[in-house]
């Protein structure tokens, strides 16, 4: 149809002015599943302090097996370390400002205040997971015992390397934690050896496993110049593993350790909301965490088929 042809019916451009568009809520590309936060066991703390008491010297605790005679029984006691480590909750805070004119006029079909808070909370939770891994004070990578740090044999993460981690966290290991590129690199090494890893379904998603332990991806594990790390955790307080810490019963509580409080409206008609997220992490015993260092994710292999 040429531009000079007569119009015989209503056209699309004009018709769309009478139609309603179905609108999504704002999409945020940086949102991740945050598997680490889901898989950790979370412990409520009082007054924001968590003290990890430990036995001083287990080798000094003496017991005896009965010899069916009248020999004297040993006498013993369990001593504790004098200065146990205390973990303090860390806070992730921000203030969300929304102009009242915006929230009054443009909150249909999606509430502007709710969406502003939702997206802000998502960003804060992403930061929370990053801190659980990388924090200088309590992050996993900065709290691994020297004897629990393993180096790769040849750079690329091999089944032998992950076996070394399993040797160090052999008591009820829960999951490996690695950058997605590290998991892909491990998959390539398995394919090269002809031992494709099995898979398991968690939370409706599939994960590859090694020796029955799932490899959980997180883009918060550092990746620099093609090198990264792989972690292995045992989790839970009853297992003397790694536990997440949070403050319960917060004013304006919206979730575990999460608080949203209205701060008022200023003379510029800006409504302010204080959003706070309190959390930390504790490694209860040294053998609850091991790290594979110097993991090279840049190695690829060429396969020849006959």
Curated annotation (Swiss-Prot):
Result of knocking out the encoding gene: No growth phenotype of a single sprI or double srpI-cyd deletion mutant in the presence or absence of sulfur.
Pfam families xrefs: SrpI-like (PF19307)
Site feature (May bind cargo) residues: 262, 273
Site (5-fold pore central residue): 192, 194, 196, 304
Family (UniProt): Belongs to the encapsulin family. Family 2A subfamily.
Comment, domains: Has 4 domains; an N-terminal arm not found in the type 1 subfamily, a discontinuous peripheral domain (P), an elongated loop (E) and the discontinuous axial domain (A).
Task of the protein: Shell component of a type 2A encapsulin nanocompartment. Expression in E.coli generates nanocompartments with an average diameter of 25 nm. They can be disassembled by treatment with 6M guanidine hydrochloride and reassembled with cargo. The nanocompartment is probably involved in sulfur metabolism. Probably allows passage of cysteine into its interior; during growth in light the physiological pH is 8-8.4, about 30-54% of free cysteine (charge -1) would be able to pass through the shell.
Protein name, UniProt field: Type 2A encapsulin shell protein SrpI
The species this protein was found in: Synechococcus elongatus (strain ATCC 33912 / PCC 7942 / FACHB-805) (Anacystis nidulans R2)
Lineage, uppermost ranks: Bacteria, Bacillati, Cyanobacteriota, Cyanophyceae, Synechococcales
